[in-house]
Amino acid sequence: EYETITKRHSPGVFTDKPLQVGGTEGRRDATARGGIISVREACNAYGFDPTKAFAIQGFGDAGQRAALLHKEMLGGGKLIAASDSRGAIMNKNGLDPEELVHHKLKTGSVLKFPGSKEIPHEQVLELDVEILYPAALENAINIKNAKNIKARVVCELANGPTTPEADKILFKNNVHVI
């Protein structure tokens, strides 16, 4: 549409295109990688420990990439919970990100991942983790559940996962939102 309006070829204007038509190399990882870099800097600045437990609400593209990149880029960390549109799972001893991605691709869901137990969707957001990645739904963290968020860092990979009212509560509770 932009090219139609301007009447010129401009491949750099929009993302998520194949490389052959001007897409960006690294696009697949871009959202998650940017989030992880921001988490790394927040941890360095405020003394948080990225090698502790983390959870991902929304195990789609961004959530999967964050799970895979977290350990690689932050020197460790234990994924203890993940959710998708069909349900949520947890294992306090950790979920292997690579195996979970494979399982999701094979079955279409995180549910029934070996060694995990099913938990309510909303519980993923309220677990006692160092870092929480809301990577699925707008308004997932809202006035009703913000007081229950125990993460020290919330790294928003979804579009608008935290409502303005919830953001005020998180700020008051010293939860850092990226």
Predicted regions, residues:
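Rossmann-fold NAD(P)-binding glycine/threonine-rich loop
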Residues: 136-178
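Structural motif
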Residues: 55, 131-133, 155
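N-terminal ligand-binding/catalytic initiation module
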Residues: 1-25, 38
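Conserved acidic residues
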Residues: 80, 130, 152
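Flexible, charged surface loops at secondary-structure boundaries
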Residues: 124-128, 147-149
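Glycine-rich phosphate/diphosphate-binding loop of Rossmann-like nucleotide-binding domains
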Residues: 26-126
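Short, glycine-/Ser/Thr-/acidic-enriched flexible segments
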Residues: 3, 43, 61-62, 86-87, ...
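A short, structure-level motif marking secondary-structure boundaries and short turns
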Residues: 23-24, 52, 150-153
